[in-house]
Amino acid sequence: MKNKFIFFTLNLLLAVLGAVLFALSHPNYLNLNGFPFFAYIALIPFFLLLKRTKLKFSFLWGAFSGALSYFIFNFWIIFFHPLAIYIIIAKYCILYSVLFFVLKIIDSYFSRYSFIFQTIAWVAFEYLNTLGFLGYSYGIMGYTQWNFPILIRVSSIFGVWGISFLLVFFSACSASFLFEFYKEKDIKNVYQRYKLPMMIWVGTFFAFILYGAFTKIDLSEAQRARIALVQPNRDPWLGNLEVYRNNYEELKNLSEKALKNFPDIELVVWPETAFIPMIRWHYKYTSTYNPNSLLVRELLHFLDNQKVPFLIGNDDGVLDEKFSDNNFDNLEDKRLDYNAALLFIPKKNVSPPEPQTYRKMHLVPFTEHFPYQKLFPRFYEFLKENDTHFWEKGKEANLLEFNNFKIGTPICFEDTFGYISKAFSKKGANIIINLTNDAWANSAVSQYQHLSMAVFRAVENRLPVLRATSSGQTAFIDQNGNIQEMLPPFIKDILVADVTVLTEGHKTVYSYLGDFFGVLCTIVLILNLCFIIINKFIKRSEVK
C-alpha cells in the first residue's frame, strides 16, 4: 500500500511539474517574456510519467495534465468571459487524455525509439488543435522561442511546427534516456544508444541557427512607410453613448497629435472595434438626429478633412441581402454584424461611407461565434444571455490598398493562426496590420502571449507586422522577426513606426505551402496508428 502511494505521488509530482514548466515557458506572471529555455525540458516530466503509467491510466493522467497546464497558462482567460475557463479546461481534459493515450500506445509499441514517433504525435496534435470551430493556437511549444529571431526564421519554411518539433524531440529523447539510465544504471551503454539521435538534434539546432543567420533580409535599402498606431487604453467593459463619444474624442486627439508631430505620416490606424457605433449602418438606416448617427457623421467629417487614410476597427452592420433596402420594418432583425477593418481615404470613400473592407473570418468560439444553434438551441440561448456578442464570419482575405501598399488586416484572434496571414501574403500583401483589443483581460500576460504568436507571422511570410491594440502590445515587428518598437501596456499613446516595406514582396516556402509540416506530422501519425492496429490484428490471427 505504501509503495502504491509513493508511486502515485511521484506520478502526480511529474504531472504538476510538467504543467508548471509548460506554463513558465510561455509569457507568464513571473516573467512577461517567459522562460524560453524551460521549453526544452518542459515536457520531460510528461514523457517520464507516460513511461511509468499503464495504458488504462494514461487517459486520466492526460486529462489532469492538460487541465492543469492550461489553467495555469491561460489563467487570465477568466476575465474574458465567465464560461471561457470552463471551456478551456474541458477541451484540454479531452485533448490531452487522447494525446497521452496515443503517446502511451506509441511508447508501448515502438519501445526504445518511441520518442521519435511521440514527437511527431505531439506536433500533429498541436496542429489539429488549431483547426475548426474549436481551433486555439495558444500553448503551441514553438511560440516559446519568439524572442530568438535567429532561430525562428526557419519558420519561413516549416511554420511554427518546425520549432515545436525541435523542442518536443529534445524533451522526448531526454526522458527516454533518463528512464533507461534509471532502469539499467549503465551510463555508457545508454549513452551509446542515444548518441546518434542527440547528435542529429544538435546538428539540426545549429542548422536552424545558420539558416536564420544567412537568410536575414537586408532592410537598409527598403522603402519606408511612416504609420501611426493609436493605443487608446480604453475600458471595453463600459458601453454607452457617453463612453463612445469620449473614446472617439480620445482617438481623435491622439491622431491629431501624431499628425501634428509627424506631418509625413501615410496612414493612421485605430485598433479593433475602436469606434462604436456602427458607421455604415447608422449613416444609412438611422435618423440624422439619432445620437449614434450624429456621432458617426462627426467621425466622417473628421476623416474627410484629413490628408491621410485612416484604418479603423468597427462593428460593421449591413442589411442582409435577403431583404430589400426599401423595407424599413424591423431593421435590426435584418442586420448582419461583422467585426471589420475599414480603410477610409479622404475625398474618395468617406462620405457617403464606402470604405475598403476586411471582415474577420476566424471568430472566437462560443463568445463571437456558435454555428450549432439548431443542434443546441438551449445552449445557444444560454450563451446569448451570458454577455456574448455574435458576429457573422467574413468570407474573403481582402487586401486594403493605399498609395503603393497592399495590407492584410487579421483582426485580434486571427493573427494567432498562420493560415490567415499566409492568405494575405499569397494575394500580394506587403504589410500585415493586426487590429486587436485584448484590454478585456486587463492582463499583460495575455497581451504578451498574443504578441509571441504575432512575431511568427512576420518571419513565416517575411512581411512587416504592425499591431494596433487597445491596451497592448502595440508594436512594429520587421521581416526578420525583430520587434523594432513597442509601446508599454496600459497607457494612452501613439507609436509612429517607420515600416520597412519590400514592395515586390518576398515569398517564402511557407507563403506557398503553409502548414505542410503540421499536415505531414498528422499523416505520419495516422499511418503509424494504422500500422500498429493492423500489426495487432495480424498477431492475433497468427495466435488463433
UniProtKB/Swiss-Prot annotation:
Q: What is its EC number?
A: 2.3.1.269
Q: Any idea where the CN hydrolase domain is?
A: 225-501
Q: Where are the transmembrane segments?
A: 30-50, 57-79, 91-111, 115-135, 157-177, 197-217, 514-534
**Which GO-annotated molecular functions does the record name?**
N-acyltransferase activity
GO process annotations (BP):
lipoprotein biosynthetic process
- Where in the cell does this protein reside? Cell inner membrane
Main subcellular localisation: membrane
Q: Which UniProt keywords apply?
A: Acyltransferase, Cell inner membrane, Cell membrane, Membrane, Transferase, Transmembrane, Transmembrane helix
User: Which pathway does this polypeptide act in?
Assistant: Protein modification; lipoprotein biosynthesis (N-acyl transfer)
Give Gene Ontology CC terms.
Answer: plasma membrane
Q: How does it sit in the membrane?
A: Multi-pass membrane protein
Cysteines paired by S-S bonds: none
One family from Pfam that matches here is CN_hydrolase
The record's listing under InterPro entries reads: Apolipo_AcylTrfase (IPR004563), C-N_Hydrolase (IPR003010), C-N_Hydrolase_sf (IPR036526), LNT_N (IPR045378)
- Function per UniProt: Catalyzes the phospholipid dependent N-acylation of the N-terminal cysteine of apolipoprotein, the last step in lipoprotein maturation.
Quote the PANTHER family the UniProt record gives. Answer: APOLIPOPROTEIN N-ACYLTRANSFERASE (PTHR38686:SF1)
Family in the record = Belongs to the CN hydrolase family. Apolipoprotein N-acyltransferase subfamily.
The name of this protein is Apolipoprotein N-acyltransferase 1
Provide the species name.
Treponema denticola (strain ATCC 35405 / DSM 14222 / CIP 103919 / JCM 8153 / KCTC 15104)
